[in-house]
C-alpha cells in the first residue's frame, strides 16, 4: 500500500504540474453553487486516476462489460466537466438509460431487505431492477452534490473503504482493488485539501458507482450483514439529494440546476461567517470534517451491531432527525443572508 501511495503521489503531482502550466482540465466556476463554494483555481484530474485503476482492474479480470459500464458513466461526467454537457436534466436521462442497460445486462440486483412484503416484491426481476437503478442513480448524483466542498466526498468514501478493509476482512470481495483505491484516495485527498485537485463530476460519478456496486456485492455474499448497515454506509450523500428533491418539490421549484441550499453548503457558510478564516481551504476542511466525523462516529457504533437490523434502522432514523434539525436551525440563521 505504501509503495502504491508513493507512486500515486508522484503521478498526480506530475499531471497536476502539467495541467497547471498549460491550464488543462481547469474547473470553470460557471455556476452559482461553484462560485459560492470557492473561487480558487483547481483541476478535475482526480477522476482520471480512479478511472485508470478501475479500467486496469476490469481489463485484467476480463470484466469488459463492467469496464464499459464504468467508462460510459465516467464519460458523461467528463463531458460535464468540460462544459460540453451542461443540461443536468439530459445528463440524468443518459445516466438512467445507461443504468437500465447495464443493470439488466449484468443482472445487478438488491438482495434481501429483511422486510417480507418487500422481499416478495423483489422476487419480481423488473421491480428489483427498477429499485436498483433508482438507488444507484440517487447515490451517483447525491455524491456529486456533496462534492461541492473540498475533502467532503473523498474523505467520506475513504471512511467507507477503510471500514471495509479493516473491519470486514472475512468477506469475499476484491480487497486488492479496494486497497489500491483507498491508497489513491488518500493521495488525492492531500491535493484536494489545498484545493488543487478535485474529482470533478467524472470522478464523483465513477467513484460512487464503484462504491454502490461493491456494497451490493457485499450484501449479496454475506447474509450476516444487515442490508441496513449497507444503507447506513451511504446514507449521507443519498439523503442530501433526496432531501433536496423534497425541499424543491415543497417549494414548487422544478429546476434541475444546482443551488446553494444544501446542508454542507450551509455549514460552510456558517464557518465562513463566524470563524472568518482567511484560508478558504481551511474552511472547506473544517466543514467537511464536521460532517465526516459525525458519520464516522455513527458508523463506528454500527460496526458493533452489524447484523442487528433494528439498531441499523434506529441509527438511520437518528441520522435523518439530526440532519433535519441542523438544516432547519441553519436555514433560520442564514435566511436573512440567502438570496
What is the predicted role of each segment?
Residues 41-49, 204, 280-294:
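Select subsegments of transmembrane alpha-helices in polytopic membrane proteins
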Residues 1-238:
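"…together with the soluble PPM/PP2C metallo-phosphatase catalytic core" -> "…together
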Residues 223-228, 245, 257-258, 311-314:
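Extended hydrophobic-aromatic, low-complexity segments
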Amino acid at each position: 500500500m505504501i509503495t502504491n501511495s508513493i507512486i500515486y503521489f508522484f503521478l498526480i503531482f506530475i499531471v497536476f504540474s502539467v495541467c497547471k502550466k498549460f491550464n488543462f482540465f481547469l474547473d470553470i466556476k460557471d455556476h452559482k453553487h461553484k462560485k459560492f463554494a470557492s473561487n480558487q483555481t483547481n483541476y478535475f484530474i482526480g477522476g482520471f486516476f480512479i478511472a485508470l485503476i478501475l479500467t486496469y482492474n476490469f481489463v485484467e479480470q476480463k470484466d469488459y462489460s463492467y469496464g464499459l459500464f464504468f467508462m460510459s458513466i465516467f464519460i458523461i461526467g467528463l463531458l460535464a466537466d468540460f462544459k460540453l454537457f451542461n443540461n443536468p436534466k439530459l445528463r440524468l436521462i443518459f445516466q438512467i438509460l445507461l443504468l437500465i442497460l447495464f443493470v439488466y445486462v449484468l443482472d445487478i440486483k438488491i438482495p434481501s431487505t429483511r422486510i417480507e412484503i418487500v422481499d416478495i416484491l423483489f422476487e419480481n426481476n423488473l421491480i428489483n431492477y427498477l429499485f436498483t437503478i433508482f438507488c444507484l442513480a440517487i447515490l451517483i448524483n447525491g455524491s456529486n452534490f456533496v462534492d461541492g466542498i473540498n475533502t467532503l466526498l473523498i474523505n467520506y468514501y475513504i471512511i467507507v473503504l477503510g471500514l471495509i478493509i479493516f473491519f470486514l476482512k472475512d468477506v469475499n470481495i476484491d480487497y486488492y482493488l479496494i486497497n489500491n483505491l483507498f491508497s489513491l484516495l488518500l493521495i488525492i485527498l492531500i491535493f484536494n485539501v489545498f484545493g488543487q485537485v478535485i474529482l470533478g463530476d467524472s470522478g464523483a460519478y465513477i467513484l460512487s458507482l464503484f462504491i454502490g456496486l461493491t456494497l451490493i456485492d457485499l450484501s449479496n455474499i454475506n447474509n450476516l450483514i444487515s442490508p441496513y448497515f449497507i444503507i447506513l454506509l451511504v446514507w449521507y450523500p443519498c439523503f442530501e439529494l433526496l432531501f433536496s428533491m423534497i425541499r424543491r418539490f415543497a417549494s414548487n421549484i422544478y429546476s434541475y440546476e444546482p443551488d446553494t441550499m444544501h446542508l454542507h453548503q450551509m455549514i460552510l457558510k456558517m464557518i465562513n461567517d463566524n470563524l472568518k478564516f482567511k484560508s478558504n481551504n481551511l474552511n472547506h476542511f473544517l466543514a467537511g470534517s464536521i460532517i465526516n466525523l459525525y458519520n464516522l462516529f455513527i458508523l463506528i457504533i454500527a460496526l458493533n451491531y452489524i447484523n442487528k437490523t433494528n439498531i441499523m434502522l434506529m441509527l438511520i432514523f437518528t441520522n435523518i432527525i439530526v440532519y433535519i434539525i441542523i438544516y432547519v436551525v441553519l436555514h433560520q440563521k442564514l435566511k436573512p443572508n440567502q438570496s
